[in-house]
Amino acid sequence: TDEYYEFDKANSAYNRGGPESMLSMLNTNLDFALTDYVTVNFKALADAIDVLGGLDIEMTNAECVHANNYNREVSEAQGVEYEAIPYDEDLGDDYSEVRHVSGALATSYARIRYGGGDDAKRTSRQRIVINLMVQKLKQNPTKIPEILDKVMGNVSTSLTKNEILELGMHAVTYTMGTSYAYPFQLCYGENVVNALGEDVVIPVTLEFNVRELHEYLYPGLSYEPSAAVTEYSDYIARKSGYDEDMIGYVLNQGPGAEADSVIAGD
């Protein structure tokens, strides 16, 4: 939820109220104080990757099939000719190798929501793409102004171009840390659909997950959940039946689970 709307999927906030609603949703549900944002469309991401010369991504044959399907839409959005990743189907769906792909295909890979892992795997793919982009930027930071010139028409942000350029030039100082899908402890599937009438991911519990998130992001700092977080957490627990007694008995993708490499500022 945010200050404008009732409970719904978190990602519906942007569609309903744009950046202001999105920031409100994040701040209200996670006890943050975010004021700035950057959003990009498919074309911006694909164009940025092309300026970097494409990416080398390890993909299974099954992921190649899905990426090729998504690329029909992405290549059209980018305004480039459709291309497909070649693969040998005789090697089976699980066969994996590193493939050099264009911006459109890398964006298509990041969109895959099918196969094992569900939404957590999809967001993992997105972090893989961002990780690889940062690595290439560190190798050639002079590409940053070219990327900005290429993509700014497809970017919505509260920051000025000069502010983005200044932030981007610090890319060479970034190190690669670890991150996890969020919420850390969660539930989804048939039981949630039966309880809520919607196919959604729910935190178990919201209050527990927000505590864990603040400890992960700001280790050692004292934090107590706001009244809003506690209220929303109790509401979700009552509606779903997944309360604090279920912590530790549901899917765990937080600290202690397998992590992904992501960006961490020095």
Give, region by region, the residue ranges found by the protein language model:
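Structural recognition of the beta-strand scaffold that forms the well-ordered cores
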Residues: 36-39, 108-109, 179-183
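Aromatic-residue hotspot detector
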Residues: 42-45, 112, 228
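Second-shell loop/turn segments in exported
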Residues: 7-16, 30-36, 112-121, 134-138, ...
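Amphipathic, coiled-coil-like alpha-helical scaffolding segments used for oligomerization/assembly
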Residues: 12-87, 155-164
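Extracytoplasmic/secreted envelope proteins and their assembly/folding machinery
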Residues: 7, 11, 19-27, 42-46, ...
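C-terminal solvent-exposed extensions
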Residues: 1, 5, 139, 145, ...
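Flexible, polar/acidic helix-loop-strand segments at domain edges
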Residues: 47-143, 147
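Sec-exported extracytoplasmic/periplasmic mature domains
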Residues: 15, 27-31, 50-57, 115, ...
